[in-house]
């Protein structure tokens, strides 16, 4: 009888799929991954299909994915994505919807370190900062700002398109709708090449642009221009975080959606069909054992293209077969160090005189990318940032785990070191083509968009796109998919 149970479940699912027709909504939807992408797409899917649809969210680790915290000395600190741009409209909406609050900002000065001395130092005076940029680099910073603003102005069109229900089956189609061939070409040309064409100097690229890209992606100005522009936009705008931790957005959305969170590793997705209608069998394993279930719609909201085989998800029964092995990811190690900064390494023998809370680096030194004096996720009204001579919690971002000798280079002494290792972003340039959101009729790959650019808001944009794509495909509203000249269409719909 136990052996018959899976067969009965399969038969029931197939009969339900055969009976479904016309305007009937899907019965069950599976989402693989409970990071910001998976949490957001569960919310958007329920928003479009209605509350009666059962949504199962599979997560092998902790809800939140790359939004995570680490406890240091009885306080929690961000160990994953630390902040969001002010123009992150979906994230702003989530925070309002969930009744969360922006974390109180604690101001700190930044600088770019070149291994022997600081290349650029921020002051407390805005006009003096502008003068220093002009004195060292001419009008390169203005040309950079104009270039980034032009890209962002076009990218912001996606919110209007999504508000009108339009979706895209591939990353290239989405980019073309926003910036035509310019955006598509920006995924094939480097940041450095694109900035040189608009008059930004090589020195400014080496000293400033490279430091920002290392801080965001751990990569150089040889990375594609589109991803670079999105990163540089984050460096120019005002940033914010969620009080209590950014991961609260993920858990809050899943709770709001009443999604069924299944703590398990999805091992395969197998295609079945009845009367021409696709049905997907999702197999998974957890501490109890192996099992599977059937779904009308499946969304993969976790990276498939990891070259270290950490993603063991396979696809069966698809013709042609689904390619899931191209591309590599950039490893990033975040170390939270509770200790005393070695200010002498940065040219300040007296730690009381060290003025910076955030340090970016150029290509040298190579063993770390950024060093930040960070604040806990809960900031009281009386909170103050630690003085440079005091023991503080520092966040060190590096391409590899830090050796003890490297820690001793950065810190005079320390009480504790806790690390989080991430496959943080795609290694841009390691994949020859842009992937597609639609892998099959109702099988979608949300993380496809991070091969164009990678950020929390980009994942939220991808989540909305996939939810709309699934909805439009389910109800055969093909006029809402991969449409050209959307700016004109949207204007005529107003």
Curated annotation (Swiss-Prot):
The keyword Oxidoreductase applies. This is Prenylcysteine oxidase 1-like. One of its GO terms (biological process) is prenylcysteine catabolic process. It comes from the Eukaryota. GO terms for cellular component: extracellular region; membrane; platelet alpha granule lumen. Likely to have oxidoreductase activity. Required in the mevalonate pathway to regulate prenylation and enhances the bactericidal activity of neutrophils. Keywords: FAD, Flavoprotein, Glycoprotein, Oxidoreductase, Secreted, Signal. Gene3D superfamilies: FAD/NAD(P)-binding domain, Protoporphyrinogen oxidase, mitochondrial, domain 2. InterPro entries: FAD/NAD-bd_sf, Prenylcys_lyase, Prenylcysteine_Oxase1. It is found in: Secreted. Its main location: secreted. GO terms for molecular function: prenylcysteine oxidase activity. Its cofactor is FAD. Its EC number is 1.8.3.-.
